[in-house]
Amino acid sequence: MMGAKVVTGRSTTQGLAQQHGGVSNVVETPFNQASCCGPVSWTSGCHSLTESRCSRLLYILLHVGASAICCLLLSKTVVERVWGKAHGIQMPSVLCAHLFGSSDCPVLSGSGAVYRVCAGTATFHLLQAVLLVRLHSPTNPRAQLHNSFWSLKLLFLLGLCVVAFCIPDEDLFPAWHYIGICGGFTFILLQLVLITAFAQSWNKNWQTGAAQDCSWLLGVSLATLGFYSMAGVGAVLLFHQYTHPDGCLLNKMLLSLHLCFCGLLSLLSIAPCIRRKQPNSGLLQASIISCYIMYLTFSALSSRPPETITFQGQNHTLCLPGRNKMEPQIPDTSVAVFSAGIMYACVLFACNEASYLAELFGPLWIIKVYKYEFQKPSVCFCCPQTVEPEDGQRSRARSADQETPPAAQVQSQHLSYSYSGFHFAFFLASLYVMVTLTNWFSYEEAELEKTFTKGSWATFWVKVASCWACVLLYLGLLLAPLLAPHSESPPP
């Protein structure tokens, strides 16, 4: 997780280059030039980053680029100004007749285009996830599929997107829509698991230090106060911006309910019956969850359609950020951009952390990450950097202090993160981005401008449900040990 650093080995070609001295210097340049299409790692010419970081960065850039293209194709303003087409970009009639035998062809913009681009990126990552399953060593030939052949992989990705555009709407939408919904919900659950594991690991880590040194107790207190302050300020701003004395009853009820959830989870975190089974349970983890609940509440309220009431013979729009008087309101695009930015940052966080934990704890990382107990505290406030071997499993370790560049590395024996898990997380992320941009269940008339400014009830209730799922998940983590009365509690 954040703060944990990785030491990875250099590629085989670089190791041979160092051993053979001058001869390798002549051969190294052609190999570096061919690395985009060949098996030589692209990072052989990148001495400031490790191979794993370079590969991960490039995949992130590919995903960001694909998501940006989806936004442009979904934007009615961009389509009208760039292509001058008010009803979307049409496929050339000659190509359309050749592929489909008629003039009824898929539109190259709008929600259909988003579905097709995301279908290409999702298939791209799913295929790599399958091909890289049970890969644990960077020296395995299959690791080159992840770290090399960049030009070929880019062409393959473009080819998948082109093939998706050749599929008629009636064949694509019915099945792919439900696949996207299932993948989107799965990715939401993955995010919730990660944020609860993040909160619990941070709390266990620093509470372990607080039991040994008072300075750690000060850090726990300051962090707890900081998160509760952010949650409180967020709640006040939400009441001020998204409620009105003459309306917005649903917003008021939702905010009040979620504040009650935060209070309930905080009380349970320090309840004596909970602390007997979980001595390290405390307000730090509850404050992090409370802060995340307020973010999910903001995300839900900013995604709902505005409320309109009649006052003195005039229609007035309420429940939008900005003015709190009985005056016409306009959508605030800055709030939409801020919400979209946080959403995508959470997407990238989930993809990277899931791949790291999958390699650190193995296939059952979702369960093992909650059971891990820290033996000594670390300034790194999240997950363990080293997991001891258990029942014959291999040991996986991360360096906590520095990351040595490739020029001074010894070849690593294990991956710093799970390549297969990384691609599967991006497969789910592609589906999540697809359904989020197209308003989940109401994708037919989706437009970028409406998605982030006018909202939809489908998106609103999905985000409310994700908030309630977060509450239930954390509540289950607190109460689950009580269901096993004969289990021994770990030492504080």
Swiss-Prot record:
Tagged with keyword Iron: no
Compartments in which it is found: Membrane
Any single biological process term in GO: phospholipid biosynthetic process
UniProt keyword terms in alphabetical order: Lipid biosynthesis, Lipid metabolism, Membrane, Phospholipid biosynthesis, Phospholipid metabolism, Transmembrane, Transmembrane helix
Principal localisation: membrane
TM segment ranges: 59-79, 113-133, 148-168, 179-199, 219-239, 254-274, 281-301, 330-350, 421-441, 464-484
Recorded topology in the membrane: Multi-pass membrane protein
A Gene Ontology cellular-component term: membrane
Recorded family membership: Belongs to the TDE1 family.
The protein's role, per its UniProt record: Incorporates a polar amino acid serine into membranes and facilitates the synthesis of two serine-derived lipids, phosphatidylserine and sphingolipids.
Descriptive protein name: Serine incorporator 4
Biological source species: Mus musculus (Mouse)
